[in-house]
């Protein structure tokens, strides 16, 4: 199974009681995934596709590999977050994923099924959104060193993207270094739980094609001049 997917999230719409809105963080990731998946069907799968059931439910599980490229918007540009190591904790570009879920198949014709799936992808990383540490207290001084006093440091975007809380920004939207120092880096980021990994839920609608030996003669390359009707069943 090969997939291209986008995941994203942002704090501003969150319930104020969740304490996420003040972080003002967001991300977007567009990734590629390749996985090997096995299915267990409610009704037995027939040897010949022409005799398969018109409707079937199934469970599935598998293992795969996905890219992991979270980005955040700074001005009009989307910046790659992984190379910046905002939390001083490097993570891999490729991650393991474990697809699980349920699905349904409806027989459209001899060679194709309409499929609908509800699936959840488990992972072994907490950095699909580039956010893991509870706050910046352990690395805020490194962020400030890269930023400088007024953004003249060697890598100022690290601090700009790590701290978006408006309480620690100046009137121009730039990090207020003195406020950050006075706070001691106790500025919230993530859960801070090492054992909690990221995952994502999706709904998939697709077409499944059965590549039986007679598909080329009977469906794709059949003589359409002599045969006027389209044969579905």
What label would you give each PLM region?
Residues 1-77:
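Gram-negative (and chloroplast) outer-membrane scaffold detector with strong preference
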Residues 139-197:
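Flexible glycine-rich, low-complexity coil/linker segments exposed to the extracellular/periplasmic environment
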């Amino acid at each position: 199974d090969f997939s291209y997917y986008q995941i994203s999230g942002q704090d501003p719409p969150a319930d104020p009681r969740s304490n996420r809105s003040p972080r003002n963080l967001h991300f977007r990731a567009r990734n590629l995934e390749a996985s090997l998946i096995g299915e267990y069907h409610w009704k037995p799968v027939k040897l010949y596709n022409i005799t398969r059931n018109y409707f079937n439910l199934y469970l599935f599980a598998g293992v795969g590999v996905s890219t992991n490229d979270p980005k955040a918007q700074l001005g009009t540009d989307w910046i790659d977050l992984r190379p910046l190591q905002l939390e001083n904790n490097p993570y891999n570009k490729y991650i393991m994923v474990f697809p699980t879920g349920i699905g349904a198949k409806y027989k459209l014709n001899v060679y194709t099924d309409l499929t609908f799936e509800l699936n959840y992808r488990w992972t072994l990383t907490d950095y699909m959104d580039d956010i893991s540490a509870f706050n910046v207290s352990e690395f805020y001084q490194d962020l400030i060193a890269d930023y400088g006093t007024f953004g003249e440091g060697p890598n100022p975007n690290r601090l700009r993207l790590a701290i978006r809380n408006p309480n620690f920004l100046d009137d121009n939207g730039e990090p207020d270094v003195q406020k950050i120092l006075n706070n001691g880096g106790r500025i919230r980021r993530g859960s801070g739980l090492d054992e909690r990994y990221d995952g994502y839920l999706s709904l998939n609608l697709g077409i499944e094609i059965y590549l039986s030996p007679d598909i080329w003669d009977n469906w794709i390359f059949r003589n359409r001049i002599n045969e006027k009707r389209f044969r579905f069943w």
